[in-house]
Amino acid sequence: MDEKARLLRVRARLKRKKPKFLRQEWWRFPKFKNDPKWRRPKGIDSKMRLKKKGKPRSPSIGWSSPRAVRGLHPSGYEEVLVHNVKELEAIDPTRQAARIARTVGARKREAIIARAKELGIKVLNAR
């Protein structure tokens, strides 16, 4: 657990420095501003593809987080999406935490939270 906590701190530090990777010339076109996602530059004269100074950064393997903590919640738990009380039974409370699905209503949400408390499972989005 000690090593995992250290790697989570390393990941948080790396994420603070990591830029948002947006597609080339996203600022010029409204259709790109409203849909910010990465697309690889493929133009033959593209300065971004050639990694010129002053141009936006491109994703590369060096920006990734440590493999042991990749995809984990900042608390260190692996997230498991839960739709009902029965799905809580499959969760390992030592390394997994529940996230209640957005389609779950108030009554079932209360039941899930109550059962999770009995089982000692952390609920990430318990209001």
UniProtKB/Swiss-Prot annotation:
It comes from Thermococcus gammatolerans (strain DSM 15229 / JCM 11827 / EJ3). One of its GO terms (biological process) is translation. It comes from the Archaea. Pfam families: Ribosomal_L32e. InterPro entries: Ribosomal_eL32, Ribosomal_eL32_arc, Ribosomal_eL32_CS, Ribosomal_eL32_sf. This is Large ribosomal subunit protein eL32. Residues 38-48 have a biased composition (Basic and acidic residues). Keywords: Ribonucleoprotein, Ribosomal protein. GO terms for molecular function: structural constituent of ribosome. GO terms for cellular component: cytosolic large ribosomal subunit. Residues 38-66 are annotated as: Disordered. Belongs to the eukaryotic ribosomal protein eL32 family. The lineage of its organism: Archaea, Methanobacteriati, Methanobacteriota, Thermococci, Thermococcales.
